Amino acid sequence: MKTYYMFGDSLMRGVMPDEAWNYHSSDAIGFEAMQAQYNMKFLNFAMPTFTSERVKMWLTQVISSHPVPDVAFLECGGNDCDYDWKSICEGKCDYEHRHRVDPQDFKKNYEDMIHLLQEKGAAATSEIATPIAIEMYLSHLLESGISREVMSEYVNSVQQMQDEYAEYGDIMRAVSKENGCEILSLRESFLALDDMKAYYSKDGMHPNEAGYALIRGDFEKYFASAAGII
């Protein structure tokens, strides 16, 4: 029986906001059922709000205190690419350093995590996160109090933000290929949709039940292939 560890952020915890804007974890992806279905052990160490820096620290701690898994999923990038709106609104962040984690630092963190796992004898599977429903996300920011004037100084277009989120995924792909890691991308299932917004919660970042069902399908294909079912 193979053992899988998951390291990531709120996406892998099935997090969704309720009507009062309280965020709750869920088993919307269905990892519990997949353990029995595909005869494997799955431990979820994903933590909401974590950037790659926090994931790396957490992974280091977990790997030093738990049995080494056969495979560890590494899912991050969404929080890294997100703008540091708190610092921006306080005038403490210039345009060049708008991301919570700069691309070059993100790349280094991701390389470090892969190397740590490989040194321990675990295979790393890079998990490319879902895209962001940018227009919904920007509307959410405006409703949360970010001024349109401040936003316009940092966001030139929806396409700009789409390209930046894709860039972090491209970094993961490049690092993964350089280090011989398998890649599981969740992006394509969403990008193929006619109306992607219908699969997201109202913040534009977290999928809704329908969106998490798409993610569940991608994982079912992955585990079925790993188990030799397909």
Task: Locate the predicted segments by residue.
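Alpha-helical cap/lid subdomain in secreted, periplasmic
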Residues: 60-209, 213-230
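Short, electropositive, low-hydrophobicity segments enriched in small/polar residues
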Residues: 12-14, 18, 53, 81, ...
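Residue-level detector of flexible, active-site-proximal loop/helix-junction positions
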Residues: 11, 49-51, 190
